[in-house]
């Protein structure tokens, strides 16, 4: 019985730990449902970022960010950092932005 209680306490505590969002994620096209790209989510200096590491659709190969503004304008979409400056608030990653490379628009982002 004591072992069961210890096991239940252990699993309860592990459920309270935040799930890491870091790693490789696959994006999906909203309209077609096809897998569109691989995005690497990573931490740097305590902030969370996301970079497109590979475009999966043949028609997207070699595309550049035509509608982006500033330093991202004209850059290849593969390699573009699209998730920027998310801060951990103790419960979630907040106060960052995400770039839509198709439209060039920036949106508020949280995870």
List where the protein language model places each region.
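N-terminal helix-cap/turn-to-beta initiation motif at the start of protein domains
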Residues: 12-24
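Central antiparallel beta-sheet cores of small beta-barrel/beta-sandwich binding domains
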Residues: 27-108
């Amino acid at each position: 019985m004591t072992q069961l209680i210890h096991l239940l306490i252990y699993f309860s505590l592990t459920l309270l730990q935040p799930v890491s969002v870091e790693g490789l994620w696959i994006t999906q096209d909203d309209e077609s449902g096809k897998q569109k790209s691989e995005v690497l989510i990573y931490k740097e200096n305590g902030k969370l970022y996301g970079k497109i590491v590979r475009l999966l659709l043949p028609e997207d190969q070699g595309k550049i960010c035509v509608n982006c503004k500033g330093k991202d304008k004209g850059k290849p979409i593969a390699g573009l950092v699209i998730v920027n400056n998310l801060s951990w608030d103790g419960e979630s990653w907040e106060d960052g932005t995400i770039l839509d490379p198709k439209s060039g628009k920036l949106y508020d982002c949280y995870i």
